[in-house]
């Protein structure tokens, strides 16, 4: 393991010019990256059942739902619905369960997902200049209760929240140190203004030192630890200059703005992998990280651990007397890295890339070796669910819990936390930046995976209901992969309450935003062009593609609420639902290759499907060093 990291260090040094590191900014870990023993609270931490929301989330929701009333009133009032939206929200606001309950989900897909998703968040944020003008959707973020992300979408969610719920514009501007400076690869390290590191070699030594500290304290580590530390340098604005070393995911819950309910609840998603498995199936356990807890609603676990005390040695849901409490395990970078442990996924997607055959062969051999040694996962040990409920499941008998990228089960949009009945979500704005086809555009596979899982005969869906969606061929043949589509428009057709899903697939409005998941370096202009394109995706070019789109967004927001309150929908919603709701039509013949053209005028040179050269050179060099190219 350390030999492999040393090789990566050597490769990075050999292919990079000397670099600097700048400063970044919730650190509350007791000993930096190393989890440490601390005094237990008077009520010792324990695992709780997943039959309800946590007391923390329940009490927070009482505050947050009230805080969405005014932003929602303002937003709906701007969307040309032709009825008294403010009056309706005022009438139902006395009972929060009748208010529209909005969620936003941002898919995985590396930096492509980060930047395209950032465009969506920027469009939904009323703080973005111009976002509350006619044709725009600013205020949807302020009206939302939940925001979920996985993999690259998780980096986006994490970076926004760990930098004090900052704006996308601020992250682009450089006002937060050197976060979001992607012109150099994560393998090389960030550019430095404050010269903490003089070179890439120093950067890698720092990563190694931090992870060694965790290992020396008795915790098993994997490649995800190094990956997470590297991500922190790109996404956390730590003013001490040490790359978010002491930042924890649970510390989000301690910030005053979050406690006041001034922002949605952030959730990251990851998948479980049983001991001895390499590939992740559709019935794998789906875990979530929210600011208070780590766990799963799936029947395999059906429990949640207090996130702040991960690393403590729980047994059958309790922390035995004599066992110390541990804090600092939920390092923010490690959590983001867990949700984006792409190493296994790279093997699955290699043949869909334009990498040379030699590179594919080398890459496959390296990653297979990593997977065989168990280094491609995030190790959560001690396993907080060891012996929990006296379960016979494989996870319960393992002292460690293996967790991987949240999209490896095919559910590349983090819908799982949002379709749980106890959360009562009404509408999900699902931003899909998946690379499903040969040119890295989405084709609805992520929605299909979630729908099929809800029907799985194994019972893994555990009572969740998801609207019907067509097969992926139909998505492409009907053009549902090119424009927004609503699923679940008529709640009367559902077997139980479920959200309306507004599907927002990545498409080329102003630039070709289908960059490769393998691309690890972006110029500022390329980054910004894809963010602008993402803004255009969710606003339909600020309603220039369809002037009725903002009204239709309002209809999607209101539909479930008005159904519950037996209120007639605005007349404009009839035409909106006719235009955007999937009507059940299926066309499953093999589609032609999807090669779209720009929907709006180009803002840049073509940014289509490119590989990260530094990554490729690094992999080949490692392969040569390991004797894998013979």
From Swiss-Prot:
Residues 607-630 form a propeptide. Residues 39-587 form the PLA2c domain. Keywords: Cell membrane, Glycoprotein, GPI-anchor, Hydrolase, Lipid degradation, Lipid metabolism, Lipoprotein, Membrane, Signal. Residues 1-16 form the signal peptide. InterPro entries: Acyl_Trfase/lysoPLipase, LysoPLipase_cat_dom. Belongs to the lysophospholipase family. It is an enzyme of class 3 (hydrolase). One of its GO terms (molecular function) is phospholipase A2 activity. It is found in: Cell membrane. Its EC number is 3.1.1.5. It comes from the Eukaryota. GO terms for cellular component: cytosol; endoplasmic reticulum; plasma membrane; side of membrane. The keyword Manganese does not apply. The keyword Cytoplasm does not apply. PROSITE patterns: PLA2C. One of its GO terms (biological process) is glycerophospholipid catabolic process. It is a lipid-anchor; GPI-anchor. It catalyses: a 1-acyl-sn-glycero-3-phosphocholine + H2O = sn-glycerol 3-phosphocholine + a fatty acid + H(+). Its main location: membrane. Induction: Strongly induced by lecithin. Glycans are attached at residues 56, 95, 164, 220, 283, 351, 390, 443, 456, 462, 493, 514, 542, 566, 583. Catalyzes the release of fatty acids from lysophospholipids. A lipid is attached at residue 606 (GPI-like-anchor amidated asparagine). This is Lysophospholipase 3.
């Amino acid at each position: 393991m350390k030999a492999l990291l040393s090789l990566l260090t050597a490769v990075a040094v050999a292919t990079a010019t000397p670099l600097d590191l700048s400063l970044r900014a919730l650190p509350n870990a007791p000993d930096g990256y190393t989890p440490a023993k601390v005094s237990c609270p008077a009520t010792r931490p324990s695992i709780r059942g997943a039959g309800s929301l946590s007391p923390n989330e329940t009490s927070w929701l009482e505050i947050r739902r009230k805080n969405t009333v005014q932003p929602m009133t303002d937003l709906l009032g701007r969307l040309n619905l032709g009825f008294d939206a403010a009056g309706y929200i005022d009438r139902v606001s006395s009972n929060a369960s009748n208010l529209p309950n909005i969620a936003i989900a941002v898919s995985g897909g590396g930096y492509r997902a980060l930047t395209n998703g950032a465009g969506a968040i920027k469009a939904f944020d009323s703080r973005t200049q111009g976002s509350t003008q006619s044709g725009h959707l600013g205020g949807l973020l302020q009206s939302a209760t939940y925001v979920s992300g996985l993999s690259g979408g998780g980096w986006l969610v994490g970076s926004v929240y760990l930098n004090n719920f900052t704006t996308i514009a601020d992250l682009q501007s450089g006002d937060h140190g050197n976060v979001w400076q992607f012109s150099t690869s994560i393998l090389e390290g960030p550019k430095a203004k404050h010269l903490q590191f003089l070179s890439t070699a120093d950067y890698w030594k720092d990563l190694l030192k931090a992870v060694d500290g965790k290992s020396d304290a008795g915790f098993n580590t994997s490649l995800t630890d190094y990956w997470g530390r590297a991500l922190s340098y790109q996404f956390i604005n730590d003013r001490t200059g040490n790359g978010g070393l002491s930042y924890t995911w649970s510390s989000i819950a301690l910030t005053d703005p979050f406690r006041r309910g001034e922002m949605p609840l952030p959730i990251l998603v990851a998948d479980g992998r049983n001991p001895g498995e390499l590939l992740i199936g559709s019935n794998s356990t789906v875990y979530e990280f929210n600011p208070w807890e780590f766990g799963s609603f799936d029947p395999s676990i059906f429990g949640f651990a207090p996130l702040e005390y991960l690393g403590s040695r729980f047994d059958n849901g309790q922390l035995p007397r004599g066992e110390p409490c541990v804090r600092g395990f939920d390092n923010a970078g490690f959590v983001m890295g867990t949700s984006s442990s792409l190493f296994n996924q790279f093997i699955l997607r290699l043949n869909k890339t334009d990498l040379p055959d030699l590179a594919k062969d080398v890459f496959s051999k390296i990653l297979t070796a990593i997977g065989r040694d168990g280094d491609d996962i995030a190790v959560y040990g001690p396993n907080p669910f060891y012996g929990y409920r006296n379960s016979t499941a494989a996870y319960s008998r393992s002292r460690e819990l293996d967790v991987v990228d949240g999209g490896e089960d095919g559910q590349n949009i983090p819908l799982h936390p949002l379709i749980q009945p106890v959360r009562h979500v009404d509408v999900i704005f699902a931003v899909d930046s998946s690379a499903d086809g040969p040119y890295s555009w989405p084709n609805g596979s992520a929605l299909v995976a979630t729908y099929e899982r809800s029907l799985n005969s194994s019972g893994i869906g555990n009572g969740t209901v998801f609207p019907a969606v067509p097969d992926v061929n139909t998505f492409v043949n009907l053009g549902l992969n090119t424009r927004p589509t609503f699923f679940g428009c008529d709640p009367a057709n559902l077997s139980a309450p479920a959200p309306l899903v507004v599907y927002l697939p990545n498409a080329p409005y102003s630039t070709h935003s289908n960059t490769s998941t393998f691309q690890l370096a972006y110029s500022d202009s390329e980054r910004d062009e894809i963010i602008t394109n993402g803004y255009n995706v969710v606003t339909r070019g600020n309603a220039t593609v369809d002037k009725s789109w903002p009204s239709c967004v309002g209809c999607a927001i209101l539909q479930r609420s008005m159904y519950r309150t037996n209120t007639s929908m605005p007349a404009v919603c009839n035409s909106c639902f006719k235009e955007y709701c999937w009507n059940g039509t299926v066309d499953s013949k093999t589609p032609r290759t999807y090669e779209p053209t720009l929907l709006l005028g180009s803002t840049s040179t073509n940014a289509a499907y490119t590989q990260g050269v530094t990554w490729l050179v690094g992999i080949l060099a490692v392969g040569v060093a390991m004797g894998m190219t013979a």
